[in-house]
Amino acid sequence: MASVAIVTGGTSGLGEAIAELLRERGMQVVTVSRRDSADVTGNAAHEDTVARAVAHAESLGDITLLVNCAGVGLFGAAGSYVEEDVRQVIDANLIATILFCDELFPRFTRDGGTIVNILSTAALQAKVNESVYCAAKWGARGYTEVLKTEAKGTKARVISVAPGGMHTPFWEQAREGFMDPKAIARVIVDALDAAVNVSSIVIER
């Protein structure tokens, strides 16, 4: 059967670049996002979207890879956020990651498979005007580190990726020194085929 990857946030930015590269290397790919161009359209932080994505992927072959790349960034000084903004950032950057991992991690430990959770350098250090985003990414990092621990001695592999700023629609304005998402995608996909066990990737601009 074909090897299938699920890529959340797979219709723009880094997620799209990863999905395209995986297809070039022979994998079937199911993209998940709110955009109509996704293979599965919906909110990745909702269980029904997870279920539809997994069912669609299973119809194509064996799910062997999950890339959690869905994310939202809303920025401002601490104390300036409204509840709707907080929930949107936490849902996209943390809840979606947890729900997709919780669905696929058990089968990966049994049958084999890889989870790649796209974090951010905001998961590694405090950044001014990014309090809620940092909170979500630090949470995703903590969850991912626990998955790595629970994966030991099983057939599952878990990789965390913390890239710096990239030229993607995530940012309203590109900044000097931002990186090419296609270059970052190559680093990530190459790590999947590496002869050594890669569990953490930090890519700084």
Predicted regions: what they are:
Residues 101, 136:
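Active-site helix of classical SDR
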Residues 11, 19:
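N-terminal Rossmann NAD(P)H-binding glycine-rich loop of SDR-like oxidoreductase domains
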Residues 77-78, 85-90:
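Substrate-binding pocket helix/loop in short-chain dehydrogenase/reductase
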Residues 36-48:
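Rossmann-fold cofactor-recognition segment
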Residues 120:
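Residue(s) in the substrate-gating loop at a strand-loop-helix junction
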